[in-house]
A protein has these predicted regions:
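Selected alpha-helical membrane-embedding segments in polytopic membrane proteins
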Residues: 6, 10-76
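Membrane-interface helix-boundary motifs at transmembrane edges
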Residues: 8-11, 74-85, 134-140
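Juxtamembrane "helix-exit" motif on the non-cytosolic side of transmembrane helices
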Residues: 35-40, 102-110, 156-162
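Non-cytosolic membrane-interface motifs at loop->transmembrane helix junctions
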Residues: 45-51, 109-122
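Helix-adjacent hinge/juxtasegments
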Residues: 66-98
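Hydrophobic, membrane-inserted alpha-helices
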Residues: 99-100, 122-132, 148-152
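Membrane-helix boundary connector in multi-pass membrane proteins
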Residues: 105-116, 127-142
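Terminal transmembrane helical module of multi-pass membrane proteins
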Residues: 134-162
Length: 162
């Protein structure tokens, strides 16, 4: 992990390679989706109802990924769960990721209800970014992740209900 330029307070522009790995892990369901030959795939075939929300969602989601990889705390190391707070939020991030994977398992198994999609597939990825932000003391990621959660939820729910 490297720090190149101080942004503000204890936040630096840098590079955290595990951020890239954590992003890739969260994307595994999309990588394996073609192997399942789904009869229906509402997540990938939604009718777009709001161009503005679509753009906001894409910008915020991409920003979460960039912030996770390129913003690091002054005292951060490559990987640490030494403090109680770090252990808690790392455990939350792992739990959220596992719930997301559970939801994808339901989805791939044919349970494609709006409830399953919204709870496990839509809500969990932004919460994953928020938990990682809290774990890594990355205030920008945490804040953008919360906004992404709201926009992502409203956008996908509106599309699924169309």
């Amino acid at each position: 992990m490297v720090r190149w330029l101080k942004l503000f307070d204890h936040q630096y522009f840098g590079f955290w390679v595990l951020g890239l790995v954590l992003f890739a892990i969260q994307e595994i369901p999309y990588m394996v989706m073609p192997l399942f030959h789904l009869e229906t795939n509402p997540i990938m075939n939604m009718v777009e109802t709001s161009a503005a929300l679509d753009v906001c969602e894409k910008v915020l989601g991409s920003l979460c990924i960039a912030l996770m990889i390129f913003v690091v705390h002054e005292e951060a190391v490559l990987f640490s769960v030494a403090e109680g707070r770090e252990r808690l939020f790392f455990a939350v991030a792992v739990g959220v990721l596992l719930l997301n994977f559970f939801g994808w398992g339901l989805y791939f198994g044919g349970n494609q209800s709006v409830f399953v999609m919204m709870l496990f597939i839509v809500v969990m990825p932004p919460l994953y970014y928020v938990a990682i932000g809290l774990w890594r003391r990355n205030v920008l990621l945490t804040a953008v992740g919360v906004v992404f959660l709201v926009v992502h939820f409203l956008h996908v729910y509106g599309n699924l209900k169309a």
